[in-house]
A protein has these predicted regions:
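Anionic-ligand binding patches
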Residues: 49-197
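N-terminal polybasic phosphate/anion-binding patch
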Residues: 2-77
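Polar low-complexity intrinsically disordered regions
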Residues: 1-3, 196-197
Length: 197
């Protein structure tokens, strides 16, 4: 049985569990006879602690994956996939009103090509958005204070607090990972679509 190594740019439990859970869904399609090993590493995103734009979220996820590619080259590792995960805020103006959404993004690379995926978004309360965007408080600290708990980011995350645990941080990243891996586990369709252009 082949062993496929998937390097993840985080050591946080919800992120690693999200990748593992996503693999349970698409792994048999990606590599039918393979065993998967998820490896977590602390790598820098190159963006702020709480990204506040879609561009910053996407850049952070991609830069984490690219850091893993470089790490594999330096260590002479034969990892097959590199996963960068980034959570944060996306601000949208609609009819002059600001709406701030919590989103989770993934970027998956095989070392040559990469693809993005994201979760849905949940609108955060205006007071929480103000605390993070105007006062510069990191989201993990602000959500702990708003919820009256400690260590939320390593548990259900802001997603869980905002959705009464109907959607957790792990759930959101799982969706982002499923979406980012789609061009790999559904490569036939993606190649056909590219050829039809």
């Amino acid at each position: 049985m082949d062993k496929i190594h998937i390097a993840v740019g985080s050591t946080r439990r919800p992120k690693l569990a999200a990748v593992t859970q996503a693999l349970e869904s698409f792994g048999p399609v990606l590599e039918p006879a393979a065993e998967f090993a998820v490896l977590g590493f602390d790598v820098e995103s190159g963006v702020s602690h709480t990204p506040s734009t879609r561009d910053e979220l996407m850049r952070g996820a991609r830069q984490r994956a690219e850091s893993l590619v470089r790490l594999a080259q330096q260590r002479h590792e034969a990892w097959q996939y590199f996963v960068g995960l980034e959570g944060g805020l996306d601000t949208v103006q609609v009819d002059g009103a600001r709406h701030v959404f919590l989103e989770s993004w993934a970027y998956v690379s095989d070392g040559s090509v990469g693809h993005y995926g994201r979760s849905g978004g949940v609108e955060i309360p205006a007071a929480l958005a103000h605390e993070v965007l105007e006062n510069g408080v990191e989201l993990s600290q602000a959500i702990d204070r708003f919820a009256g708990e400690v260590g939320i980011r390593d548990a259900q995350g802001a997603w869980g607090v905002l959705s009464r645990n109907l959607i957790t941080r792990q759930d959101a990243f799982r969706v982002a990972v499923l979406a980012a891996f789609a061009p790999f586990y559904n490569s036939k369709m993606y190649r056909a679509a590219s050829a039809a252009r």
